[in-house]
């Protein structure tokens, strides 16, 4: 019987699911495992600068990967604990990261040896227990016979639930053999079928609400993206012609060039015409909602109707009634078979708000502002772009822009760990290399956030991520924090860097750097056809006033300050 090592089995499983880049760092408890990655044709080891960045990179990769999956490998204790921030972010934002940790050998654990990287108390499962709180499921493997099934179980759960999973793999098991034939049976990635009786009740109730509605809207959020419901959402818009809106976390969940797209709804922080359109609706079909503070304008949704249908990844809610086990993908597919017949015969498609992204004419020498930047940038985006925006001015500014067709938006609105996007850009760029090297990956990051995770630009240079644009918004420190509290406080200051020296510092081969500070320089940059071609890694430092911020961020900062001060 043909056999392969358990280590190779793991990487072959990843390869079957089109997870062909593995992130992480080597350590003495995972070295034998890492040898096996080179035995699988088409796979590569990213080799990150540190574990936190590796976790962010894995998160970004998963958001671009067709199966919504990624993988990373770290070492016991000192390596894996550096991942906790990144893995917690992936858990909160529903991202399927397969987190494998190389742990000491089974015999060392049994003897409770006082090994390095331990707490010195013989407890080898303490870190596993920590990760249980931020993992959908986990396996601390101890037996070679059950190991393949445990690996498959964790990978399946990462896909189905779109959340991180933890696998602890002892160093002595890596080279043990398992039947190669196990790979012939693919992992079952099918979703649990909905309860037929509950689903029938859901569909009939939704159809009745649709038949009675004269002003329905569709509101799409992040989990529609994470749980692969974009095709169903697109079909629902096409079949019903209902106005559709997204949340900040839902940007790129729908085609924003669709004439039925009305904009981004952020509660009280929405544009007035968007706020009126959503809140005056008599039926709201909410798909994949994640109702966090920054995603809802500090919970300021002002629906005037009680006719709200919420489709989620593991339940559906209609008004006050919850239907556990009726997940949205199957429910939407079922609804689509009849929804057109359910529409009120007197329904006339309601006009959607129109947003004209045109800046007020200004002299070329006019200093650049956030408002001008975020209005102008939409005209430079093109179909298929992967657009990544850092927590702060970028994540709020991008809300007012329009994404082109087939774009992917990445922003950590819920978890909000500053510096996340630099690592995520590395992962997204490497995923894009595998899918389409001509697909542009565009990062907008503040000068303060950049300083937390800047090392991962080195990894981008190593892998020649020449599809990458790094826009560094230099507003001299932590503007979002200044807006919330401490405008003049020293703790919101940072040491200025010579940012344009970073690419040569990291030994980039083909690169380009620019610094812009005026309206004319931005216009010229976006008019430059050569600049639009993704043939080298580029960094553009965008000089902006310190307290200049998108209007919605200024308003959100006031709401956040109020929330923080409440007793």
Curated annotation (Swiss-Prot):
<dbReference type="InterPro" id="IPR011766">
    <property type="entry name" value="TPP_enzyme_TPP-bd"/>
</dbReference>
<dbReference type="GO" id="GO:0030445">
    <property type="term" value="C:yeast-form cell wall"/>
</dbReference>
<dbReference type="GO" id="GO:0030446">
    <property type="term" value="C:hyphal cell wall"/>
</dbReference>
<dbReference type="GO" id="GO:0005886">
    <property type="term" value="C:plasma membrane"/>
</dbReference>
<dbReference type="InterPro" id="IPR029061">
    <property type="entry name" value="THDP-binding"/>
</dbReference>
<feature type="binding site">
    <location>
        <position position="477"/>
    </location>
    <ligand>
        <name>Mg(2+)</name>
    </ligand>
</feature>
<feature type="binding site">
    <location>
        <begin position="448"/>
        <end position="449"/>
    </location>
    <ligand>
        <name>thiamine diphosphate</name>
    </ligand>
</feature>
<comment type="similarity">
    <text>Belongs to the TPP enzyme family.</text>
</comment>
<dbReference type="GO" id="GO:0030976">
    <property type="term" value="F:thiamine pyrophosphate binding"/>
</dbReference>
<dbReference type="InterPro" id="IPR000399">
    <property type="entry name" value="TPP-bd_CS"/>
</dbReference>
<dbReference type="InterPro" id="IPR047213">
    <property type="entry name" value="TPP_PYR_PDC_IPDC-like"/>
</dbReference>
<dbReference type="Pfam" id="PF00205">
    <property type="entry name" value="TPP_enzyme_M"/>
</dbReference>
<dbReference type="GO" id="GO:0004737">
    <property type="term" value="F:pyruvate decarboxylase activity"/>
</dbReference>
<keyword id="KW-0210">Decarboxylase</keyword>
<feature type="binding site">
    <location>
        <position position="393"/>
    </location>
    <ligand>
        <name>thiamine diphosphate</name>
    </ligand>
</feature>
<dbReference type="InterPro" id="IPR047214">
    <property type="entry name" value="TPP_PDC_IPDC"/>
</dbReference>
<feature type="binding site">
    <location>
        <begin position="475"/>
        <end position="480"/>
    </location>
    <ligand>
        <name>thiamine diphosphate</name>
    </ligand>
</feature>
<feature type="binding site">
    <location>
        <position position="117"/>
    </location>
    <ligand>
        <name>pyruvate</name>
    </ligand>
</feature>
<dbReference type="GO" id="GO:0005829">
    <property type="term" value="C:cytosol"/>
</dbReference>
<dbReference type="InterPro" id="IPR012000">
    <property type="entry name" value="Thiamin_PyroP_enz_cen_dom"/>
</dbReference>
<keyword id="KW-0479">Metal-binding</keyword>
<feature type="binding site">
    <location>
        <position position="475"/>
    </location>
    <ligand>
        <name>Mg(2+)</name>
    </ligand>
</feature>
<keyword id="KW-0460">Magnesium</keyword>
<dbReference type="Pfam" id="PF02775">
    <property type="entry name" value="TPP_enzyme_C"/>
</dbReference>
<dbReference type="Pfam" id="PF02776">
    <property type="entry name" value="TPP_enzyme_N"/>
</dbReference>
<comment type="subunit">
    <text>Homotetramer.</text>
</comment>
<dbReference type="GO" id="GO:0062040">
    <property type="term" value="C:fungal biofilm matrix"/>
</dbReference>
<feature type="binding site">
    <location>
        <position position="447"/>
    </location>
    <ligand>
        <name>Mg(2+)</name>
    </ligand>
</feature>
<dbReference type="InterPro" id="IPR012110">
    <property type="entry name" value="PDC/IPDC-like"/>
</dbReference>
<keyword id="KW-0786">Thiamine pyrophosphate</keyword>
<feature type="binding site">
    <location>
        <begin position="416"/>
        <end position="418"/>
    </location>
    <ligand>
        <name>thiamine diphosphate</name>
    </ligand>
</feature>
<dbReference type="InterPro" id="IPR012001">
    <property type="entry name" value="Thiamin_PyroP_enz_TPP-bd_dom"/>
</dbReference>
<dbReference type="GO" id="GO:0009986">
    <property type="term" value="C:cell surface"/>
</dbReference>
<protein>
    <recommendedName>
        <fullName>Pyruvate decarboxylase</fullName>
        <ecNumber>4.1.1.1</ecNumber>
    </recommendedName>
</protein>
<dbReference type="GO" id="GO:0000287">
    <property type="term" value="F:magnesium ion binding"/>
</dbReference>
<feature type="binding site">
    <location>
        <position position="28"/>
    </location>
    <ligand>
        <name>pyruvate</name>
    </ligand>
</feature>
<dbReference type="InterPro" id="IPR029035">
    <property type="entry name" value="DHS-like_NAD/FAD-binding_dom"/>
</dbReference>
<keyword id="KW-0963">Cytoplasm</keyword>
<dbReference type="GO" id="GO:0005634">
    <property type="term" value="C:nucleus"/>
</dbReference>
<keyword id="KW-0456">Lyase</keyword>
<dbReference type="GO" id="GO:0000949">
    <property type="term" value="P:aromatic amino acid family catabolic process to alcohol via Ehrlich pathway"/>
</dbReference>
<feature type="binding site">
    <location>
        <position position="481"/>
    </location>
    <ligand>
        <name>pyruvate</name>
    </ligand>
</feature>
